[in-house]
Amino acid sequence: AYGTSEARLGKLIKGQRDAWIIASKVGEEFVDGRSVFDFSAAHTRVSVERSLQRLNTDRLDIVLVHSDGDDAHILNHLGTLNILKTLKNEGKIRAIGFSPKTEAGAIQALHTSDVLMLTLNLREQKMLGVIAQAHTQGVGVLVKKGLQSGSLASDDRGASATGAEPIETSLRFLFGQPEVSSVVIGTINPAHLRSNVASALRVLSRIL
């Protein structure tokens, strides 16, 4: 959940909260349509409390720090993960994590995170080593940009050679990584969402 979507999701999950695993992010705000970053402890607490209110829940299952690209500065100087640890100790968050932009940031965040959100897809696989290390250390992995932010084409690696549908080819690759806990797929189109869910179910039925 993120931004306005949290309020929408809050209405959907009313009366069935325990059936959902809810993840949100801190660090990025949209002000008048512009992206603004604030990683301060005060703003992080406000952001989490606001998410709880919008979602009408007493806890968030996962909260990730959404990096602006300067992973080292966030991790070394801003204490954002420290305030998330405090909120976790207060029972408002179950798992905390980091969504880095760099491999170095991902490796550093391994030591202070329960979960990492990492980019992985057929074209971009530089995080595979970090994913393996996360698994060894018991850190969960959520995949972002697994479908290349909607830019998949039939000439993607593996798709044209087999004649397979590119989304299913991508999902088969992602779910074939035993260290991957979940794949985050964003859309604003209900038809696309239904199609992606159907593709994921087909792939998982062959793997599991």
Q: Locations of the language-model features?
A:
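N-terminal binding-site loop/beta-alpha segment at the start of enzyme catalytic domains
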Residues: 1-20
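Beta/alpha (TIM)-barrel catalytic core signal, keyed to glycine-rich beta->alpha loops juxtaposed to Asp/Glu
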Residues: 2, 12, 67-208
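Alpha-helical scaffolding within the catalytic cores
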Residues: 7-10, 47-50, 125-129
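A short, structured active-site edge motif that brings together acidic residues
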Residues: 19-31, 65-66
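Active-site pocket-shaping loop/turn-to-helix segments
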Residues: 33-45
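CE4/NodB-like, metal-dependent polysaccharide N-deacetylase domain
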Residues: 43-66, 86-90
